Amino acid sequence: MARLIFLGPPGAGKGTQAVVVAEQLQLAHISTGELLRAAVTAQTPLGIEAKGYMDRGELVPDSLVLGLVRDRLQQPDTANGWILDGFPRNRSQAEALNLLLTEINQQVDRAVNLDVPDPVIIERMLARGRADDTESVIRRRLEVYREQTAPLIDFFRDRQQLLAIDGNSEVAAVTDRLVSALQVAA
């Protein structure tokens, strides 16, 4: 069993690795973005509330996201473990997640940080060809990451939960490196 959080800058390959590793290790892949979209589509009480924020272009409050995460972590398919992708994004979310996990008798086993140099990230994201992925937008997203999310590396390192992985390779090579490191760390 493994309960994992995937960290790293935008374009590092978190989502890609989360899907592949979850499949290989038979873990539930939990994407907060997908949780939000599914709750809105299903018109759950949390989804209806979240939709109001999303329609106004506002960030969905942490309390709503945590409610969705709490519900998802208690589903039967998470019994063998899970990978949380896209959450937490800052220290206060990480602290709230730790409290939530304590309440439901779970804990994070490892926070995996995919380390990729900025020039590689910029190249990867430009290659995706998305309209909103201009170099200036990508650089701004990296700044926001450094300000808000990068401090989580120290947060999880201080708790001896951090697993740093070189993400500057082809997808399969990073996956192999990651799965091997998780097996050693288990």
Curated annotation (Swiss-Prot):
GO terms for biological process: AMP salvage. Keywords: ATP-binding, Cytoplasm, Kinase, Nucleotide biosynthesis, Nucleotide-binding, Transferase. ATP binds at residues 11-16, 128, 169. Its EC number is 2.7.4.3. Pathway: Purine metabolism; AMP biosynthesis via salvage pathway; AMP from ADP: step 1/1. It is found in: Cytoplasm. Pfam families: ADK. Its main location: cytoplasm. GO terms for molecular function: adenylate kinase activity; ATP binding. Residues 31-60 are annotated as: NMP. Catalyzes the reversible transfer of the terminal phosphate group between ATP and AMP. Plays an important role in cellular energy homeostasis and in adenine nucleotide metabolism. Consists of three domains, a large central CORE domain and two small peripheral domains, NMPbind and LID, which undergo movements during catalysis. The LID domain closes over the site of phosphoryl transfer upon ATP binding. Assembling and dissambling the active center during each catalytic cycle provides an effective means to prevent ATP hydrolysis. This is Adenylate kinase. It comes from Synechococcus elongatus (strain ATCC 33912 / PCC 7942 / FACHB-805) (Anacystis nidulans R2). The lineage of its organism: Bacteria, Bacillati, Cyanobacteriota, Cyanophyceae, Synechococcales.
